[in-house]
């Protein structure tokens, strides 16, 4: 059992910033196309974080061409280059699934956290 824990702790990233639900983030993801590798930025609102340790994931939602797009990323994945927090949001829920029902500007209406 300790062997699994030590292997998992070696795989954990050290440079993961503090972010939570309601925050607007930019996720820099490595995309491999044939032999080329490039970085794609996915910007949106974090609607959930779940799991712990090596299996921790977070889901980011954004509106692209009038359609809601959600992507789930493992926090400690080598494909996730970095996560930038652009805006801190203040929410009262752990899971922001109610944003799925909102349309237009209301889909992004989240109070900004006071400093």
From Swiss-Prot:
GO CC terms in record: cytosolic large ribosomal subunit
Biological processes per GO annotation: translation
This protein's UniProt keywords: Ribonucleoprotein, Ribosomal protein
A GO molecular-function descriptor: structural constituent of ribosome
Cited SUPFAM superfamilies: Translation proteins SH3-like domain
Domain of life: Bacteria
Family of the protein in this entry: Belongs to the bacterial ribosomal protein bL19 family.
Primary role: This protein is located at the 30S-50S ribosomal subunit interface and may play a role in the structure and function of the aminoacyl-tRNA binding site.
Entries under PANTHER family matching the protein: LARGE RIBOSOMAL SUBUNIT PROTEIN BL19M (PTHR15680:SF9), RIBOSOMAL PROTEIN L19 (PTHR15680)
Name this protein carries in UniProt: Large ribosomal subunit protein bL19
Organism: Alkaliphilus oremlandii (strain OhILAs)
């Amino acid at each position: 059992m300790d062997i699994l824990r030590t292997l998992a702790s070696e795989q954990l990233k050290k440079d993961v910033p503090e972010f939570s639900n309601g925050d607007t983030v930019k996720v820099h993801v490595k995309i491999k196309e044939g032999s080329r590798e490039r970085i794609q930025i996915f910007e949106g609102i974090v609607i959930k974080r779940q799991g712990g340790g090596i299996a921790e994931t977070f889901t980011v939602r954004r509106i692209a061409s009038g359609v809601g797009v959600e992507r789930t990323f493992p926090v400690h994945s080598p494909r996730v280059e970095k996560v930038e927090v652009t805006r801190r949001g203040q929410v009262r829920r752990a899971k922001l699934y109610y944003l799925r029902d909102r349309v237009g500007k209301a889909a992004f209406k989240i109070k900004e956290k006071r400093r």
